[in-house]
């Protein structure tokens, strides 16, 4: 396929136009008075959302060069979402401001490489300053506050706060759709761990990209499973019972994995394969924990149990299992309650006895997994569209609350970013030339999120930025109440992890755009005869 190539300023301008188109669509959702975006769907009714990353994912532009810019910014939003689960709009707006300010200087003759280096140094300095100024979060009310800001809904915020407090930092909070109109919280005995499915073909719920198994049997295997003859007898027995199967082993590969995938596609047997977490002795111990929780046995050649010889009596069970690409949650395992209680007691005793901090930490992790349980927030709403939007905002709120507990919080509403400019004064003094200009571009861009939060609330963005810059740390604009004051006291807060991810990811994309000299895209098919390619940025 032949290509079209653009160079220098023309390439950068086209990419900038794409960055702007995407960012302009996303930025209207920023802040407590942010607006909604309606997305037309190929199937079913339109979706209504105020979640930046959901809007970004939907956007593809017609002009191939502009589309490059849009996709670059989209990667900022998705990456921030993956790391912190929130803050996607802030990241997008920052990236837009950095690209705009940076390209202006490049057009005026600044060296893009030096400029980019200045931007990176500034991003690191701001990230450090944010971490240093963060307040730790503990207690139900503080967590609820973070979740309320994220979901813009006090009731949901309090639910998330309660869920997080009950299961603790290491516990699992999962979000499901409720069959009723109410949103409620349930606690179940469950265990979660950070390993997901080995093949995307196992997915059963395509919207959520999860494999959900109801009332499954669970096979725990100490070693790798690769040969089909070993696994086949067990698969046949499970297929007869008609129950779905979860396999957790050191690894599942080759013929064995291929057979599970084929069976899943043909729907002859609903199965999901997951790698066991951890390594060596820790993996062994964790599999034993799972055996106790699910009421099964770990199949281990060392103890004389061979996969091809055992029957279904070694399988554990659970009420339901949810597996995503990164984690697995086993809810209501079929193991005896007193056996689980004894295991917890034994772990507590080991924690007290051990001298090594590392061992203690790992034992505590296992204890939290066993004792923590799983909080399930069941989200209800009147219509399908409202349900989807509500579920999204609960998921964001849970992610924000987790991030807040991990690294702490800073003042929200874009003011922590704006006030982090102070951290750049010293850095700028130590740099010269175009690197110093890069720091200036960054300092300028730090006002962008606040500018748009204020504009979306109907205020003058520039005035708000000027005012907040003069206020003491932690004070800023409360766009909900349209007043200036102590944001932390008012509960206008952001998890610092979210804010930092936005800063670092937007800087890395801006740097890529600034240092672009050539853009190469596929030639659109219908323009094959026409050598000009109607560009409107020259």
Swiss-Prot record:
Positions of ATP binding: 29-32, 86-90, 413, 494
InterPro entries per record: Chaperonin_Cpn60_CS, Cpn60/GroEL, Cpn60/GroEL/TCP-1, GroEL-like_apical_dom_sf, GROEL-like_equatorial_sf, TCP-1-like_intermed_sf
One GO term of the biological process aspect: protein refolding
Keywords carried by this UniProt record: ATP-binding, Chaperone, Cytoplasm, Isomerase, Nucleotide-binding
Annotated GO CC locations: cytoplasm
Catalytic reaction(s) noted: ATP + H2O + a folded polypeptide = ADP + phosphate + an unfolded polypeptide
Molecular function (Gene Ontology), one example: ATP-dependent protein folding chaperone
Subcellular location: Cytoplasm
Pfam families listed in its UniProt record: Cpn60_TCP1
PROSITE patterns assigned to the protein according to its UniProt record, in alphabetical order: CHAPERONINS_CPN60 (PS00296)
Domain of life: Bacteria
EC number in record: 5.6.1.7
Record-stated family: Belongs to the chaperonin (HSP60) family.
PANTHER family to which the protein is assigned, alphabetical: 60 KDA HEAT SHOCK PROTEIN, MITOCHONDRIAL (PTHR45633)
Oligomer status and interactors: Forms a cylinder of 14 subunits composed of two heptameric rings stacked back-to-back. Interacts with the co-chaperonin GroES.
Protein purpose: Together with its co-chaperonin GroES, plays an essential role in assisting protein folding. The GroEL-GroES system forms a nano-cage that allows encapsulation of the non-native substrate proteins and provides a physical environment optimized to promote and accelerate protein folding.
Name listed for the protein in its UniProt record: Chaperonin GroEL 1
